[in-house]
Amino acid sequence: MAQNNAVAGFSSLQGVELNLFTIDELKAIHYATMEVLMNPGVQVSDPEARQIFKENGCEVDEKTNVVKIPEYLVRRALQLAPSRFVLWGRDKKYNTVQEAGGKVHWTCFGTGVKMCKYQSGKYVTVDSVEQDIADIAKLCDWTENIDYFSLPVSARDWAGKGAQDVHETLTPIANTAKHYHHIDPVGENVEYYRDIVKAYYGGDEEEARKKPIFSMLLCPTSPLELSVNACQVIIKGARFGMPVNVLSMAMSGGSSPVYLAGTLVTHNAEVLSGIVLAQLTVPGAKVWYGSSTTTFDLKKGTAPVGSPELGLISAAVAKLAQFYGLPSYVAGTOADAKIPDNQTGHEKTMTCFLPALAGANTIYGAGMLELGMTFSMEQLVIDNDIIKMVKKAMQGIEVSPETLAVDSIQKVGIGNNFLALKQTRLLVNYPSDPMLIDRRMYGDWAASGSKDLAAVANEKVTDVLKHHEVPPIDTDILKDMQAIVDRADKAFKES
């Protein structure tokens, strides 16, 4: 199995790290997964995908649609899948490298169906619409710590009226210069996505392949199923050169074993089956190893995402991805709380820290509330601060002759302070420096209006939406892109 410069259970991050498994434990998860891929196998609903598996040596039962994937095909797929690829932005300064064992990045959550809006000191929850996507894209374009944009909510105003998913493709691309990751693609419409990206590049399909400003996510159905839609997203994404994220959403105790190790086995089988399909379709296709796997709360009947288990599973998935030499994309910075409050801060910090310290390549969840059903722009800018502080903690403490600062200690001597030292003045930005989180004493805070964090965040959201400028797409090119959306709408209405 190709490790692609990634060492089992180890992240090449510099600073503080979290290692959950020994190499033997990772191998145990792998070999258990190989057993499951042969017995019972994976149910593959798509005839084209079953044919691809069959032509490459898999045992396929056409009555049950069950495919049994031998280990040699898994190993071959892992050797073919790239350990590194670049997510292009419309502005290349936002290009993001996804690399096994590489840097940790963050993106916003997706995909919710409601917006939590702050109005006159209170929160109101409403259905999400296309304009919300445009606003969140603009806000993410401004944020320092959101590296690329994932579809945060659905354009529910287009549900049943037009090609909703195609609107959800152009609107983000037009409203942020960062890379766009479509979390809710429709397999039969991937050609429209390709055409939109190709139109952005003036019709140059080769350039669109080399510099992908667009990528897609699909979810196997737990336990152990690949739907027609999932298969078509994988197959077409591979053929069109779009990075594809195979992300399991297993729930331990519900759609996977109650033991977290057993959940990792079914999770691994689901994700690897999708990755094998991608590599059988187009060797070298760009793929993530993805996770939104969590627990099933047997008492509440919900799938919590602000839980310690989600953080642990996401960290574990990061380690499995490193073991396989694949970039990872995992849930984190997540919350079950309904509004930005104390519970939210606790849940988000915990679920952000664990996968970050494990070296996940992308952590998605910023802006999310209510177990992933709701999105808040105020929470997004608060999460921007949380992520910044987590990044600072990840750096650890450097020990060197310079940082031990013996000369400075001797120069200042006993009972004095270090404020006047040139070294201190030069490193004024060395300590963590959140934008919104308030570190003043009570008197100064009260004198400035006694505003809580939600009010401050709302002011920042309002200011950014009013004043931040996103680099525009050329008018003629945008017209060509819009024409493709119009064509998709027409086809939807005629169908």
UniProtKB/Swiss-Prot annotation:
Family of the protein in this entry: Belongs to the trimethylamine methyltransferase family.
Gene of origin? mttB2
Q: Which domain of life is it from?
A: Archaea
Q: Which GO terms describe its biological process?
A: methanogenesis; methylation
On whether Transferase is a keyword of this UniProt record, the answer is: yes
What EC number is given for this enzyme? 2.1.1.250
Q: Which UniProt keywords apply?
A: Methanogenesis, Methyltransferase, Pyrrolysine, Transferase
Record-linked Gene3D superfamilies: Trimethylamine methyltransferase-like (3.20.20.480)
Know the name of this protein? Trimethylamine methyltransferase MttB2
Q: Name one GO molecular function term.
A: trimethylamine methyltransferase activity
For this protein, the record's InterPro entries field holds: MttB-like_sf (IPR038601), MttB_Methanosar (IPR012740), MTTB_MeTrfase (IPR010426)
Catalytic activities: Co(I)-[trimethylamine-specific corrinoid protein] + trimethylamine + H(+) = methyl-Co(III)-[trimethylamine-specific corrinoid protein] + dimethylamine
Pathway this chain belongs to:
One-carbon metabolism; methanogenesis from trimethylamine
Report quaternary structure and partners: Can form a complex with MttC.
Q: What does this protein do?
A: Catalyzes the transfer of a methyl group from trimethylamine to the corrinoid cofactor of MttC.
Which Pfam families does this UniProt record tie to the protein?
Answer: MTTB
What is the species of this protein? Methanosarcina acetivorans (strain ATCC 35395 / DSM 2834 / JCM 12185 / C2A)
Asked whether the UniProt record includes Methyltransferase among its keywords, one would answer yes
